[in-house]
A protein has these predicted regions:
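Long, positively charged amphipathic alpha-helical accessory segments at protein N-termini or as interdomain linkers
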Residues: 13-15, 23-41, 51-187
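DPxDG-like acidic metal-binding loop motif
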Residues: 1-12, 21-25
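Conserved active-site carboxylates
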Residues: 48
Length: 187
């Protein structure tokens, strides 16, 4: 009832740039959904895809590296496609493409489209090895841009307004008049 896939790449990039692959994957999934379903999903930074404020996709990116650098990066994707029921603890926050659009589409076409868009954006990313050329595209999909969000930081949570991302993919927020970069944690 879903799509569960992993994209494995061996990019020649430095370790600190690996997290941006999650953002590229998220944009590719959004592009594929929009192409097939004619609906505009949004990204809840950095790794969730939402439609009507409900999560329909999660992304987990991991890598293997050694002293010479990155050996490979794997971006795992789980998309709720045909699901119609969810456990009680997530039924108010999770959904599927079928529930949100009322239509069934071919999962193979979704996978093909996602892979196409992934490599298209990866090529753009590799030209600068940062998000500068993809920043406006990503921000156009950012679910909470201009809205107050709660940053769940290891040092404690705090409210802030989401402003966008920087060239490294960090979330930029305004917290009490100070611009902060969020590089990890939950939003």
């Amino acid at each position: 009832t879903g799509i569960y896939m992993s994209l494995c790449i061996r990019p020649n990039i430095s370790l600190e740039k690996a997290s941006m692959i999650t953002l590229i994957t998220a944009m590719a999934i959004c592009d594929a959904i929009e192409e097939l379903y004619n609906i505009s999903p949004l990204i809840k930074w950095p790794n969730d895809i939402v439609i009507n404020s409900k999560k329909i996709c999660g992304i987990l990116t991991e890598m293997s590296c050694d002293m010479d650098g990155i050996k490979y990066i794997i971006s795992g994707v789980g998309i709720n496609v045909y699901d119609t029921e969810f456990p009680d603890d997530i039924k108010d926050t999770a959904s599927s493409l079928l529930l949100e659009t009322g239509t069934k589409k071919d999962r193979a076409k979704m996978i093909s489209s996602a892979i196409y868009h992934f490599y298209e954006d990866l090529d753009t990313f590799m030209q600068t090895e940062d998000m500068s050329a993809l920043k406006s595209k990503y921000e156009s999909r950012l679910a909470n841009i201009g809205r107050e969000v709660m940053i769940l930081d290891p040092k404690g949570e705090y409210p802030a307004t989401a402003l966008g991302i920087d060239e490294t993919g960090a979330l930029l927020v305004n917290a009490n008049g100070k611009i902060k970069r969020v590089i990890s944690g939950e939003v």
